[in-house]
């Protein structure tokens, strides 16, 4: 007997059906805004992540050398891949480029609530627009997907920040701005809620801030709770921070217009840990705090395409983690029903396989979503009826030799146990808009 690997999950039909419903809600929301689906490979060159993603990702790579001696990794995230794709065909693509993709990713990290080593995300990205409306649009897609699932603003919140505010503040407060590693300081902010205060301030010190300045910096960013609170930050940070504050205000104003503003709050302690992020960043959390992991995350990465050798191309994206999203939906009581149902079970008795199969085909032709099963194991009448009950068949149609001699089928309602006979030529009826059931013939 072989056990599954730690952090790698199996999904049985009921759970997978619910997961598919959630994925469909996200993709449908993105499709309504004009995002087009792409597909991407499971393997990329390891050097791409070493160069572009940052040390945290690199430490978690499933990396190996292939038979050609190339260093390759199972994809831990999608953004570098889509950046590579944009560079490859950038001149042929109309901008803004709006793509989405749902697929698994792999990171060797500590398994815990909402975190696995194989995990699923739906990435939603816009390339070619630096306007605040692009940031607002991806926020709106995320908000629409969540509300389509039945969640409300009592269930989730987007914490919106700006990395140029954080980096600008660090440089403005530092005794020697040139000695400060702003990316390291921003990574420290990203870890703020995950480590104790002493370790957090130590990380800021390692980035080039003395202890007192690190505390001053943290006091400034943690005091911001509303848009109006940004005034003090702009005053402390100088021109660069003022420009970033103005950009953040514009994004939040656009989010209001897109209908996502009610779900957004300013949170400068949100940073996003990946080095390629540039401007506005955001994370979505369970408002109650019961689900600790972020449900959606995203932001701007305006420099990434150029770093791949392409033309300067602003970009912004968002992605939900399907595992923490499922926890949020379950906590809020909106996780889809995992109980599967079957519209019809065609039960054959005696030598009626051809007739039963023809009827099953006719029933499947009634609609794309109609589920029809029939016996493929040569089982007895009782065994077939028991199986029909186990798959939650709503209607059983008995095709027996004696029934056919009389030119009829027996139609059975599984919920009540009631049944009736129906002339063969009347089941299924021609031109009916609803699926025929026992109640139509009782």
From Swiss-Prot:
It is found in: Cytoplasm. Coiled coil: none annotated. Residues 427-442 have a biased composition (Acidic residues). GO terms for molecular function: ATP binding; histidine-tRNA ligase activity. GO terms for biological process: histidyl-tRNA aminoacylation. Pfam families: HGTP_anticodon, tRNA-synt_His. The keyword Secreted does not apply. Residues 416-442 are annotated as: Disordered. It catalyses: tRNA(His) + L-histidine + ATP = L-histidyl-tRNA(His) + AMP + diphosphate + H(+). GO terms for cellular component: cytoplasm. Its EC number is 6.1.1.21. It is an enzyme of class 6 (ligase). This is Histidine--tRNA ligase. It comes from Halorubrum lacusprofundi (strain ATCC 49239 / DSM 5036 / JCM 8891 / ACAM 34). The gene is hisS.
């Amino acid at each position: 007997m072989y056990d599954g690997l730690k952090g790698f999950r199996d999904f049985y039909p009921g759970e997978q059906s619910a997961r598919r419903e959630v994925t469909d809600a996200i993709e449908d929301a993105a499709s309504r805004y004009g995002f087009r689906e792409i597909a991407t490979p499971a393997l990329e060159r390891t050097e791409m992540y070493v160069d572009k993603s940052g040390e945290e990702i690199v430490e978690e790579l499933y990396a190996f050398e292939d038979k050609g001696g190339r260093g390759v990794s199972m994809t831990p995230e999608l953004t570098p891949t889509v950046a590579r794709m944009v560079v490859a065909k950038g001149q042929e693509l109309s901008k803004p480029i709006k793509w989405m993709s749902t697929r698994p990713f792999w990171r060797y990290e500590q398994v815990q609530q909402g975190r696995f080593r194989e995990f699923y995300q739906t990435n939603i990205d816009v390339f070619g627009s630096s306007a605040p409306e692009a940031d607002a649009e991806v926020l709106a897609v995320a908000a629409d997907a969540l509300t389509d699932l039945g969640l409300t603003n009592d269930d989730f919140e987007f914490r919106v920040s700006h990395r140029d505010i954080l980096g600008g503040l660090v440089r403005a407060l530092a005794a020697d701005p040139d000695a400060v590693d702003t990316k390291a300081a921003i990574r420290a902010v990203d870890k703020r809620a995950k480590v104790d205060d002493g370790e957090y301030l130590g990380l800021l010190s390692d980035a080039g801030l003395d202890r007192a300045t690190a505390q001053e910096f943290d006091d400034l960013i943690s005091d911001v709770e509303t848009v109006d609170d940004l005034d003090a930050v702009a005053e402390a940070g100088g021109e660069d921070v003022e420009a970033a504050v103005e950009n953040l205000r514009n994004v939040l104003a656009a989010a209001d217009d897109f209908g996502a503003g009610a779900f957004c709050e300013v949170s400068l302690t949100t940073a996003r840990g990946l080095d390629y992020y540039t401007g506005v960043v955001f994370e979505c959390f369970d408002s109650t705090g019961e689900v600790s992991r972020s449900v959606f995350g995203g932001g701007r990465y305006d420099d990434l395409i150029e770093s791949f050798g392409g033309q300067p191309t602003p970009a912004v994206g968002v992605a939900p983690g399907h595992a923490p999203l499922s926890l949020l939906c379950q906590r809020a009581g909106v996780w889809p029903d995992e109980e599967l149902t079957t519209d019809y079970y065609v039960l054959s008795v005696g030598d009626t396989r051809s007739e039963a199969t023809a009827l099953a085909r006719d029933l499947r032709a009634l609609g794309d979503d109609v589920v029809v099963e029939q016996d493929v194991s040569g089982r007895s009448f009782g065994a077939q009826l028991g199986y029909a009950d186990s798959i939650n068949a709503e209607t059983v149609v008995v095709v027996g030799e004696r029934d056919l001699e009389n030119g009829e089928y027996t139609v059975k309602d599984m919920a009540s146990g009631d049944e009736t006979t129906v002339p063969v030529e009347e089941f299924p009826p021609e031109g009916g808009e609803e699926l025929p059931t026992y109640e139509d013939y009782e």
